[in-house]
Amino acid sequence: MKRPLDFLLAICLILLRSSTFADEHTVHWNSTNSMFRNRHPSIEVRLGDVVRFVCPDNEGRKNGEYLTVYEVSEFAMGECALESNSREVIKCGVDTNTEKIIRTHQLPIGESREPPKNVAQFIRSVNPIPNGKEYQPGQTYYYITTSSGKPGGIGQQMYGLCVSKNMRLSMKVLSSQPTPSPSSKPARSRTDARRQEDFITKSSAELMGGQEDEDSENDNAHLLPRDLEIATNPKFRRPSQFDQAAASAGVLDGQFLKVVQMAKEGKTGTFENDREVQKSAEKDAWDPINRHYVADLMNSAYKNANDRVVYQREPDFLIHEEDISTNSLGYSSSSSSSLPTFLIVFLIAVNLLF
C-alpha cells in the first residue's frame, strides 16, 4: 500500500513543480477568436508550460458551436482532413447529465455559472502517466477541427470549420530554457581596426603612385615587436621608401630610376647598368656587384690553374678541315692512329716467310 502512495505523491510533486514554474497558454477554440484570422495561426511554448484548450461558451446562446479538436499531422492540417492516427484532444458537444453534475460540483464557492469546458495539455518530454502524451523540443504539433459547428456535424471528418473559419493551429515546442542567441563575430580590437586602416592606406598609396597621407610616419607605432620587424623588412616597404631599399641593395638611384622608367614603358628582358670605375679601393672591396673586382679574381684563378696542369687527356675524337675550298670535314679517332704502323710490320713479316 505504501508504494502506490509514494508513486502518487511523486506525480503530485511533479505536477506542482510544473504548475509553479510554468507558463499557461489559453487557446479559446471558437470561430470568433481573432487568432484564426491569421493565415497560419501558431504559438510557441516551452517544456514545462501548460496549454489549455477552452471550448466555445454556449451558455445562454441559441446557436452555439459544437466541435471536436484533434491533434493531427502537418499534412492533415494542410488538407483539413482527419487520419487514422489523429488524436482527439477535447470534444465540445452537448453536455450529458453526468458531465453537468461533475462540472457543477467543481464550481468555486459563490459562483453558479458553469465555466466552459476545457482541457489542459502539459508540455513535457517525459510523462509519468502511462501512455501519456509526450512533447519533444524542436518539434511542431498541429491541431484542427473538421466539425461543422452544428450538433449533428460534430463528428465530421473533413473540411468543416477548418476550411470555413480557418480553425487550425501550429504549436512549436522550445527548450525549457531560452537558447542563447548565436554569438556574433567578436568585435575587432582597436589594433586590428588600425591594421585594417593601414592596409587600406598602403593599398591606396600604391595605386596613387606612392603618395602617402600625413599620418604615414606613425603607422608602425601601434605594431607589436614581431609585426614591427615584418613591417620594417625591405620586402614590405612602401613605394616612397624604395630609394632606401635600392641603396641598401647596392643599386644607385640613377639605375633604379632607369629600371622604373623601362617598366613604365613596358620593356622586358635583361640589361646591364654602366657603372663608373670606383677609385677608392676601400669602396670597391665593399661593393657587392663590382664587376672588375670579380673579373680579376677569375683571371687569377684561371692562371693558377693552368700552371698546375701537368697532364691533359687526349680527346677521343678530333674534327679537322682537310679541304677549305670544298668545305669537306672529316674525323679521325685517336684509337686508330697506330693502324698504318701495324700494317707495315705485318707486310714485312709476310715477305720474310714467303
Swiss-Prot record:
Q: Which residues form the signal peptide?
A: 1-22
Q: Tell me the keywords, alphabetical order.
A: Cell membrane, Developmental protein, Disulfide bond, Glycoprotein, GPI-anchor, Lipoprotein, Membrane, Neurogenesis, Signal
**Which residue ranges have biased composition labelled Low complexity?**
175-186
According to its UniProt record, how is this protein modified after translation? Answer: May undergo proteolysis by metalloprotease sup-17 to give rise to a soluble form.
A Pfam short name: Ephrin
Disulfide bonds, which pairs? Answer: C55-C92, C80-C162
For this protein, the record's InterPro entries field holds: Cupredoxin, Ephrin, Ephrin_RBD
Q: Where is the lipid attached (GPI-anchor amidated serine)?
A: S335
Q: Where in the cell is it found?
A: Cell membrane
Q: Which GO terms describe its cellular component?
A: axon; neuronal cell body; plasma membrane; side of membrane
Q: What does the protein in this record do?
A: Regulates the formation or stabilization of cell-cell contacts at several stages of epithelial morphogenesis. In early embryonic development, involved in ventral closure of the epidermis. During male tail morphogenesis, regulates precursor cell sorting together with mab-20 and allows the formation of distinct sensory rays. Probably acts as a ligand for lad-2 to regulate axon guidance of several neurons including SDQL, SDQR, SMD and PLN neurons during neurogenesis.
State the protein's name.
Answer: Ephrin-4
Native source species: Caenorhabditis briggsae
